[in-house]
């Protein structure tokens, strides 16, 4: 990673942000619905379907744009859009302007973009490092992302939800939003235009690569 510092920063930013963002919402949405919207626990599962639809349609409808419009611009767009939409949803939530149905609709729209953002993070770390360390890079960034998203995010949001305060949850949303926007900016500044290029052109083998 010494010879690819900027790519390492991009990979860490993208993986950590999407992991926190995804897990913070996905693994606490049931608590939000039950604690703040009085949704019966046996009906919470019904609200999962829109999540699945948003997650599916995002990559299907705009995934190809990562090749036609460019990796860097689309990664930045999906990350920043996801962050801004979460901030807006958080504001509507804290102002009590949405109910369980519209809250779920907002999450569905957010994950339409966030699913592409998350996919692009894995794509980025898999194609921007030399072949010799590609598997190691994927494992490393996945471990970091899982540590942040799989442990920190649900724990933090669980504590915020337990306060019973919409304001506390809103601050959690803003933090997740800030992470996504920051990662999007990092990708815009330091991202690689890898579209329609061979992997060897994107990241030359270690026997040929010099310091960037």
Say what each PLM segment does:
Residues 81-97:
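C-terminal ends and interior cores of transmembrane alpha-helices
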Residues 100-116:
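Hydrophobic core of transmembrane alpha-helices in multi-pass small-molecule transporters
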């Amino acid at each position: 990673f010494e010879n690819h510092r900027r790519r390492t920063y991009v990979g860490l930013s993208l993986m950590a942000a999407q992991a926190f963002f995804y897990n913070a919402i996905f693994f606490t949405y049931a608590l939000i619905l039950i604690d703040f919207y009085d949704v019966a626990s046996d009906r919470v599962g019904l609200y999962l379907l829109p999540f699945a639809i948003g997650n599916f349609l995002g990559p299907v409808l705009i995934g190809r744009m990562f090749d036609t419009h460019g990796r860097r611009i689309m990664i930045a767009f999906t990350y920043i859009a996801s962050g801004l939409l979460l901030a807006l949803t958080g504001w509507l939530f804290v102002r009590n302007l949405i109910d369980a149905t519209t809250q779920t609709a907002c999450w569905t729209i957010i994950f339409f973009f966030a699913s592409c953002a998350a996919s692009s993070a894995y794509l980025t770390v898999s194609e921007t490092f030399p072949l010799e360390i590609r598997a190691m890079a994927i494992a490393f960034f996945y471990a970091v992302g899982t540590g942040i998203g799989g442990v920190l995010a649900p724990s933090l949001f669980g504590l915020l939800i337990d306060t019973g305060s919409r304001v506390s949850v809103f601050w959690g949303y803003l933090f997740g939003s800030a992470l996504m926007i920051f990662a999007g900016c990092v990708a815009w500044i330091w991202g690689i235009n890898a579209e329609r290029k061979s992997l060897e052109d994107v990241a030359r083998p270690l026997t040929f690569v010099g310091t960037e």
